[in-house]
Amino acid sequence: MFGFMTMNQTPIRLEDLLENVDKPLPDITRPVWRFHDNFNDLLDFWLRRHGTFRALLSDLSAAVEDFGADGPDVAEEERLMEMWSLFREQLAQHQQVEDGVYFPVVVALHPEFESAFDALFEDHGAIDACLDAVENAEDGAGMMEALLLLNDKLLGHMEAEEDLIMPLVLETPPPLEFVVYDEDGNEVGGDDVLEDEDEDDSLTYVTKN
């Protein structure tokens, strides 16, 4: 059923991202991220977004597993579809911001790691294939199998992504920040506007660094 995903369904690891990178990552490990002098609201927001996707995936898996346990239920099916639509839409928008805003900024600051970000970009495409497999599943069992693949793929991706990006950004003084402009070139805010990162396609994000 999932033959078209075989090549990319393996969760990516930090070691995979760094395969063609000669420069070592800064030695800033996960336990100290939030205590680092350069940790700021933007980084907190980005990590919390990943936390939201982890929670949504868990809720979706539980909902699919329980679906139909007490017989057909139209309301239950509608709730499940709403959960899935919300998850897929928010994830797609989040990845667009990463690919179009976050990643280019970090690559510009650390060009030695460009190949690692190319791998992350490609892995976003592999995640899309996993999402399609969930939607194209023929029955509940197939959907659950596809969700498990998606779960492993996305969790691995976010962990590797965080372990790559956080040390690079935390090493970058001053703390990484963004100025946000509307389509007329007017400054409309800073990192706080990223709370609504997916609300308005007309906004332009420019790093202060």
Where would I find each of the regions flagged by the language model?
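Small-residue-biased structural context
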Residues: 1-209
